[in-house]
């Protein structure tokens, strides 16, 4: 009986030892998997693209770099770009992620992008914007609001890029716009896709396109509209309804 009791006591202590050992091992594994960051105060970057006159500048209040990676987490970033000394933009937000390896910047939370080309200035607001510096492409799939001296525009996202002719195009998805002036003769328009070539005074509306001017509603497959002169330049398969 004493022999059996002794064996049981040994087994109990052995079980406790193994349980304690495994617990500590798991804890050590979790500890080793923790991500390490290096923090920097008020960092700055200047990125110049090879064989072009394009340049980008980035400043932030703080930056945290994940160990052994070229990825930075930024607080209160300010981003500026110059495309061949013609197109300029600046952007600010609450947070951002900079990937130097991919040459990409993701800005989030209260993003304000200002685009300037010649005498045209556009203010764009969203909660998230992706900046692809290598391909000179800015885009967002979030709700976007645009404000200019002439109009306001809301859309379900945008895409800014430079086409083969070197012209900057802003493309808006499921967009609607209206004139800033609250007058009887103000205009309103909407379409599945709205294209704005910067700098210009025209919109190209594609897919379920509608323009309302004064007492007339024009619906068409495609409409080219000058928002400065309030004139329709051209349209495809259109019909006019007067109220």
Task: Give the role of each language-model region.
Residues 1-243:
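Mature-chain termini and adjacent capping regions
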């Amino acid at each position: 009986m004493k022999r059996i009791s002794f064996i049981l006591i040994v087994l109990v202590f052995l079980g406790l030892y193994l349980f304690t050992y495994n617990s500590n091992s798991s804890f050590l594994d979790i500890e080793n998997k923790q991500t390490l960051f290096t923090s920097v105060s008020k960092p700055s970057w200047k990125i110049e693209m090879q064989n072009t006159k394009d340049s980008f500048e980035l400043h932030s209040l703080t930056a945290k770099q994940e160990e052994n990676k070229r990825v930075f987490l930024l607080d209160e970033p300010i981003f500026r770009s110059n495309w061949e000394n013609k197109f300029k933009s600046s952007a600010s937000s609450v947070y951002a992620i900079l990937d130097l390896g991919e040459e990409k910047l993701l800005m989030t939370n209260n993003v304000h992008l200002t685009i300037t080309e010649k005498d045209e200035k556009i203010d764009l607001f969203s909660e998230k914007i992706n900046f692809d510096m290598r391909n000179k492409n800015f885009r967002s799939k979030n709700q976007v609001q645009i404000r200019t001296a002439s109009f306001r525009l809301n859309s379900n996202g945008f895409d800014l890029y430079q086409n083969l002719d070197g012209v900057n195009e802003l493309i808006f998805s499921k967009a609607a716009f209206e004139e800033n002036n609250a007058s009887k003769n103000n205009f309103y328009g909407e379409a599945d896709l709205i294209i704005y070539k910067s700098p210009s005074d025209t919109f190209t509306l594609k897919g379920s396109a509608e323009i309302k001017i004064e007492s007339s509603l024009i619906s068409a497959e495609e409409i080219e509209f000058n928002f400065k002169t309030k004139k329709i330049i051209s349209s495809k398969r259109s019909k006019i309804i007067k109220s």
